[in-house]
A protein has these predicted regions:
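Cell-envelope/glycan interface and biosynthesis
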Residues: 29-142
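Catalytic cores and adjacent binding grooves of peptidoglycan-active enzymes
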Residues: 103-205
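A general marker of short, structured functional hotspots
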Residues: 23, 32, 72, 193-196
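N-terminal, Lys/Arg- and Ser/Thr-rich interaction peptides
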Residues: 1-45
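Intrinsic disorder/low-structure terminal segments
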Residues: 21-22, 26-28, 34, 66, ...
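Alpha-helical protein-protein interaction elements
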Residues: 15-21, 27-28, 59, 68, ...
Length: 205
């Protein structure tokens, strides 16, 4: 697919189905792009679609099937939008660090593909409200799904959930308790963690 050069072309990209319940258009909205009038359009739509499909099929679909509707806070971010956000302190890391992350259509420095979406789980915030309860969902995902990395934020316990060809299996948080919950090499990265999410539903697909 060519890079969209018109509204009609962008419509066609938006109609691309990434999985059973998700289309590319679901991931195109960006507050930065919207407010500052920067088109959020991929330079390499085919690569963005490929990575987005893996994200949706392997992570978002089973999460939605298990926990109900997901609220998508953000998804795809083109390099131009991300660079603007980085230079203007709008909570965007550098393009190099965001490739194969929110920038779905750029490979990372090692040539791997990846894609990230920021997700809120209404089921989680409706059922849990104690400090640190986000860890229940994080451990459930860790035990059940092939995620690459998770970053947790304080507001609504929104989570950046990444699919990547070379998963780091790392969970970090800006919500309390802050820091690294697990990563490859830590003793808690392996094994079963079901004691942390007692009462959670079984995985559905």
């Amino acid at each position: 697919m060519r890079t969209p050069g018109s509204m009609k072309g962008l419509e066609e990209l938006g109609r691309v189905r990434l999985s059973k319940n998700f289309f590319f258009r679901d991931f195109l909205f960006s507050e930065i792009a919207n407010f500052y009038a920067i088109p959020n359009i991929p330079e390499d739509p085919d690569l963005a679609i490929e990575a987005g499909r893996r994200l949706c099929e392997e992570l978002l679909e089973p999460l939605q099937a298990t926990f109900g509707r997901l609220h998508l806070r953000s998804g795809y971010r083109c390099a131009k939008v991300n660079e603007f956000g980085n230079k203007n302190n709008l909570n965007c890391s550098s393009n190099a660090n965001t490739a194969a992350d929110h920038i779905w259509d750029r490979r990372d420095a090692k040539g791997f593909t990846g894609a990230t979406a920021c997700v809120v789980f209404p089921w989680l915030v409706d059922n849990y409200n104690d400090d640190g309860d986000w860890q229940k969902m994080a451990w459930w995902i860790h035990d059940h799904l092939p995620y690459a990395s998770i970053m947790v934020f304080p507001k609504l316990w929104a989570m950046n959930i990444q699919w990547h060809e070379k998963p780091a299996r790392r969970i970090r948080s800006f919500a309390e308790p802050r820091g690294v919950l697990t990563k490859i090499g830590m003793p808690n990265n392996e094994g079963d963690h079901s004691e942390h999410y007692v009462g959670f539903p079984a995985l559905k697909r």
